[in-house]
Amino acid sequence: MPAWLSALLAALGGYLLGSIPTGYWVGRCWGGIDLRQAGSGSTGATNVLRTVGKGPALLVLLVDAAKGAAAVALGSALGSPWWVVVAALGAVIGHSRSCWLGFKGGKSVATSLGILLAMAWPVALATFGVWLLGIALTRIVSFSSLLAAVAAPLLMWALGQPLPYLLFALAGGVYVIAAHRRNIERLLAGSEPRIGQKWAQSP
């Protein structure tokens, strides 16, 4: 298969996998709400947790992670770690800019975790450990996700992963941080909700 066709299939396939609007569907079917109009406006698991509940949030987390893992499988099937990276980045972008939701979506954290699990599971576990540490210290999901986004490329390098995967962690980490820009503003203002707070209860 020509390289251009492999790249196209990886990018398009990864994007379409990532764009599956899991949180939106769960919000509609389980809570009768449009997540784009509720809470933070994100369709990710954290907003589902705040606006719908724990069970639906866990479902969204698992399915969104599976989307990322499926993108890695697609890239692997195309025969090169570079196509893995292209498909993975496509999934990250697709989750936050879904063509089914007017190019809106979530923050791509769960999808990125699924990608890391399929790409380099030791890095995924270590990154998840950093996220858990952030939760234990602050109980703020966005802050913990930002810590994990910074840690992922460092852990890729420290654990000797291939260059394509290191570059994914760098690019994906920057993208996830950029997707959290409003959260960063609220963190600086001291108004970001903690776990257990409804959106309206935030300071």
UniProtKB/Swiss-Prot annotation:
The chain crosses the membrane at residues 1-21, 52-72, 73-93, 115-135, 140-160, 161-181. One of its GO terms (molecular function) is acyl-phosphate glycerol-3-phosphate acyltransferase activity. Signal peptide: none annotated. InterPro entries: G3P_acylTferase_PlsY. It is an enzyme of class 2 (transferase). One of its GO terms (cellular component) is plasma membrane. It is a multi-pass membrane protein. Keywords: Cell inner membrane, Cell membrane, Lipid biosynthesis, Lipid metabolism, Membrane, Phospholipid biosynthesis, Phospholipid metabolism, Transferase, Transmembrane, Transmembrane helix. It catalyses: an acyl phosphate + sn-glycerol 3-phosphate = a 1-acyl-sn-glycero-3-phosphate + phosphate. Pathway: Lipid metabolism; phospholipid metabolism. Its EC number is 2.3.1.275. It is found in: Cell inner membrane. GO terms for biological process: phospholipid biosynthetic process. Probably interacts with PlsX. Catalyzes the transfer of an acyl group from acyl-phosphate (acyl-PO(4)) to glycerol-3-phosphate (G3P) to form lysophosphatidic acid (LPA). This enzyme utilizes acyl-phosphate as fatty acyl donor, but not acyl-CoA or acyl-ACP. PANTHER family: GLYCEROL-3-PHOSPHATE ACYLTRANSFERASE-RELATED, INNER MEMBRANE PROTEIN YGIH. Belongs to the PlsY family. NCBIfam families: glycerol-3-phosphate 1-O-acyltransferase PlsY (TIGR00023). This is Glycerol-3-phosphate acyltransferase. The lineage of its organism: Bacteria, Bacillati, Cyanobacteriota, Cyanophyceae, Synechococcales.
